[in-house]
Amino acid sequence: MTLDHPTPYYLYDTGLLQRTLDAIHAEIADHDNYHVHYAIKANANPGILQQISAAGLGADCVSGGEIEVALRSGFPAAAIAFAGVGKADWEIRRALEAGIGMFNVESIEELEAINDCATSLNLPARVSLRINPNVGAHTHDHIATGRIEDKFGIDMEDMVPVICSIQSMPAVEFTGLHFHIGSQLLVMDDFEALCLRINELQEQLDREGIFAPNINVGGGLGIDYDTPDVHPIPDFASYFSTFKQSLLLRPGQHLHFELGRSVVAQMGTLVARVLYVKRGKQKQFVILDAGFTDLIRPAFYGAHHAIENLTAAKEQRTQTETYDVVGPICESSDIFQKNALLKETRRGDLIAIRSAGAYGEVMASTYNCRPLPAAYFA
């Protein structure tokens, strides 16, 4: 489905979003101690956030701005987890004033800042410690977050001393452990490795007589960018069953998940129009009116998105040609796909760039003084 609106624009399938949310609920329905938080950073469109909050998910926020957006969209403050390696004092204060559920703390220095802010406001701060589990993940280097060389989290050997240090912080309450090893993960072995590492750390806590009420395993579940119509809903069954089978929770513990891409990616399509088909000596270029200012993932990560010529499909064109699909931005990296096989493409054709619901609209920019893309719902 497309709309008679100026391009480029994002088109969101709210029906698919609801089916995705229903699939998540189906997997955790028998586990009252399982809690899913939606990662606001994946897509902060207000209409999407309102639908997700109405479905009962919590929110995973990484900035004060995201906390504000989450609250305005109906997420209960108590269901908000505030992560991020660099929290400013004003963000910490706003989170405390809002009464969020927990901070996911990434360093002893941050812990001290939270205690100072909470003490000055005479408000309690519930904190989980983000531990770097040194677990590699099968994903792009830019979105792997759980290795020893990454900037995120507290080293494993520092876990117990940092927890003990909280005893001297009157405004801080230790509420659990937080982990996140990466994004766009499709190999369940990655999550199993995380479970085994958490089990090891829990045994260490047991020996020290420390109980972590909450275990937050982050997110990271990937989606099928190649054939979105074949797998419109991610493999939540395998994802959740990995934790059910491999993670050894203690009695009374709650398990938290932070899902973003897997919730919203497939519901979004970037619709663009062909400005020109440029025929060079070695290449044919399809030049769109959308660029990396509208969808930066291909330029930033080398990410793949399925691309379809909607007009050619409607007109039932049969000839297939090879094109480089590019944007109008004055940068050589403004490429959506090289050597794309498309039905014969002409000036004015509508092009769909699929699986663009996550890290698409939310990462758009006004570089080259270009307007931000519009968004519509179907």
Predicted feature locations:
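Short, glycine- and charge-enriched coil/turn segments that flank and shape catalytic ligand pockets
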Residues: 30-32, 119-122, 168, 208, ...
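Hydrophobic residues within beta-strands of alpha/beta enzymes
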Residues: 59-60, 80, 103, 177, ...
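Charged (often Lys/Glu-rich) extended helix/loop segments that serve as interaction or gating elements
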Residues: 2, 242, 253-378
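Conserved, mostly hydrophobic/aromatic
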Residues: 17, 41, 63, 95, ...
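Active-site-proximal loop/turn and secondary-structure-junction residues that shape catalytic pockets
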Residues: 40-44, 65-66, 86, 107-109, ...
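A charged N-terminal "starter" segment
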Residues: 1-125, 168-173, 203, 207-210, ...
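Active-site loop/helix belt of alpha/beta enzymes
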Residues: 134-276, 342, 368
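General structural feature for long, well-ordered alpha-helical segments within catalytic domains
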Residues: 13-16, 20, 24, 44, ...
